[in-house]
Amino acid sequence: MERIYVIPLRKAKNVPRTIRAPKAVKIVREFLMKHMKADTVKLDESINEKLWERGIQKIPPRIKVKAVKDEDGVVEATLEE
């Protein structure tokens, strides 16, 4: 199964400045676990670089992700261009 999601990261703006980027990574992972019904989510390095490109405090408001679920139920997510 392959899907493209636009994941909102507004909830990460409501945490202290110094933990916004790590919180955004958790939000992306939890979003994909919920919507793809998977227990294991592997995030590509490109997603991590996009969330951290402006530092820990200034995260993007949303991120576009391509998620692919294999037969084992593992979701691999990459940044959609």
From Swiss-Prot:
CDD domains: Ribosomal_L31e. Signal peptide: none annotated. Keywords: Ribonucleoprotein, Ribosomal protein. GO terms for biological process: cytoplasmic translation. Pfam families: Ribosomal_L31e (PF01198). One of its GO terms (cellular component) is cytosolic large ribosomal subunit. GO terms for molecular function: structural constituent of ribosome. It comes from the Archaea. SUPFAM superfamilies: Ribosomal protein L31e. Belongs to the eukaryotic ribosomal protein eL31 family. This is Large ribosomal subunit protein eL31. It comes from Methanothermobacter thermautotrophicus (strain ATCC 29096 / DSM 1053 / JCM 10044 / NBRC 100330 / Delta H) (Methanobacterium thermoautotrophicum). The gene is rpl31e.
